Design a protein with these regions (language model features):
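Amphipathic N-proximal alpha-helical interface segments
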Residues: 59-66, 137-140
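A short, polar/proline- and glycine-enriched secondary-structure boundary/capping micro-motif
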Residues: 25, 68-72, 104, 147
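Core segments of cupin and vicinal oxygen chelate
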Residues: 2, 10-56, 92-120, 128
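Histidine- and/or cysteine-centered catalytic micro-motif in compact active-site loops
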Residues: 15, 62-64, 87
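Internal, well-ordered alpha/beta segment that forms a basic, Gly-enriched binding/recognition surface
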Residues: 123
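Long, charged/polar, surface-exposed segments that mediate recognition or autoinhibition
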Residues: 71-100
Length: 147
């Protein structure tokens, strides 16, 4: 079973301001085309995946929900997730269940029931329960066109 680092996620007050800062400090910019050139809207906010020299940084700008609570508690730019990509999320799910770990459907701690992953842009993912107030581990399976 393949397991690779995929990205880190940061909660931010403003994707635009954070992008401006990253551009000024490090010359980081969104690609001109493709999946990684887009800012995506979702029910509780928006996000962008920013490729930086082979590493991806996900900027999450919440407007509601558990990530907004995390932002208020931890502050702008706080690391909220460390994501690992797997080639078979079903096997990874089974492995964690056998270990007595219940995968979560969302950052808020909602248990994932009967493998009903919430697909986002073809990706399947779940979280592992957080210990304390730190970042969550996210487990992700991507469709071939996004790898």
């Amino acid at each position: 079973m393949k397991l690779e680092f995929d990205h880190v996620g940061m909660v931010v007050k403003s994707i635009k301001k954070t992008m401006d800062n990253l551009s000024a400090l490090f010359g980081v910019e969104l690609p001109k085309s493709g999946f990684f050139s887009q800012i995506f809207e979702y029910e509780e906010g928006r996000f962008v995946m920013l490729p930086v020299n082979g590493v991806k940084i996900e900027l999450l700008q919440p407007k509601a929900g558990p990530l907004l609570d995390f932002l208020k508690e931890r502050g702008d730019g706080a690391l909220c997730e460390i994501c690992f990509r797997v080639d078979n999320i079903e096997k990874q799910y089974d492995k964690f269940k056998k270990m007595g770990i219940t995968p979560l459907d969302d950052f808020d701690g909602t248990p994932l029931i009967d493998r009903k992953y919430t697909p986002t842009h073809g990706a399947k993912f779940f979280y592992l329960p957080r210990k304390g107030k730190g970042a969550a581990f996210e487990i992700l399976e991507l469709p071939d066109e996004l790898t």
